A protein has these predicted regions:
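N-terminal secretory signal peptides that target proteins for export/translocation
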Residues: 1-20
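Long, polar low-complexity intrinsically disordered regions
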Residues: 2, 13, 25, 42-45, ...
Length: 277
């Protein structure tokens, strides 16, 4: 029974044929070469047509295979995103359950010359949290569960401290939180580095919820807010090399304007200063 190629091809769009790409072109070229070398010079018109039909059928099969692989990959990406969304929702739910007590403890840190800033943004958004879980899992070659468990800023706070009392106030605030049942699990003093200027502490609340607390001056906080856009470009894997280079340059320019309080770069916690960058 003669192979009806026109009927076969009618079920496939030109788009599928094109997406077969290099493999399809290579296969077609190979078939044509074999015909030129092996077939008689006076090959019949019917035989030549049959060989051409067979090569086109192979192209169609390759197009189907390519579509199947792409659909499978897209399905896996969608499944991972859904898993990350669930983990993000669980982290936020737990944080919201403990938030009242944590916020109350942070508000106790407010004294003359120090105050909480950006309290309305204390929760990380669900989309941002889900994206961070995916990015950290890929970067560290770890499971989504492991990446989610390491996130420390589902709840985050910023204490702005007067420049004159900054070096003394930071350790006092941490001691005050420890007395309230918090544990300091990580301390990073970034004063004197090229980029971010300030002190970050990762805490574990009495309820077992990870919390981030940043210590800033009014000026360092303002510059952090202004430079946030270039910070996002620097860590965006989709940004071009030129875009990241320009964002890095602008970050250095911004942070060179920050005035460091006396003794801020010497502040430690249990003998550790963290690492400036």
């Amino acid at each position: 029974m003669k192979y009806d190629m026109k009927q076969k091809l009618s079920r496939y769009s030109a788009r599928k044929l094109l997406r077969a790409g290099w493999a399809a072109r290579t296969l077609t070229a190979t078939v044509m070469l074999m015909m030129a070398v092996v077939a008689p010079v006076n090959v019949s018109r019917g035989y030549a047509a049959a060989a051409s039909d067979e090569s086109l059928a192979a192209v169609v099969e390759l197009a189907d295979f390519s579509d199947g692989r792409e659909a499978k990959a897209a399905g896996k990406r969608r499944e991972r995103r859904e898993q990350a969304d669930v983990l993000a929702a669980q982290l936020l739910l737990r944080a919201r359950e403990a938030e009242d007590g944590i916020t109350a403890a942070m508000q106790q840190l407010e004294t003359e010359g120090s105050y909480l800033e950006g309290l309305e943004n204390r929760f990380k958004s669900a989309d941002s949290l889900s994206g961070k879980i995916l990015a950290d899992a890929d970067a560290n070659l770890e499971s989504l569960d492991t990446a989610a468990g390491a996130i420390s800023d589902v709840l985050r706070y910023t204490l702005v401290v007067d420049e004159k009392s900054y070096a003394d106030r930071v350790p006092k605030a941490l001691h005050q939180l420890e007395a309230s049942g918090f544990t300091v699990i990580k301390f990073r003093n970034a004063w004197g580095g090229k980029f971010y200027q300030g002190i970050n502490a990762q805490l574990m609340s009495p309820e077992g919820v990870r919390v981030e607390l940043q210590f800033h001056t009014a000026q360092s906080y303002a510059i952090k807010q202004v430079s946030h856009e270039v910070y996002e470009i620097r860590r965006n894997p989709k940004a071009s090399e030129d875009e990241r280079a320009e964002a890095t340059r602008m970050s250095v320019v911004y942070n060179n304007h920050v005035i460091m309080p006396d003794g801020a770069d010497k502040v430690t916690w249990e003998g550790k200063t963290g690492q400036a960058a």
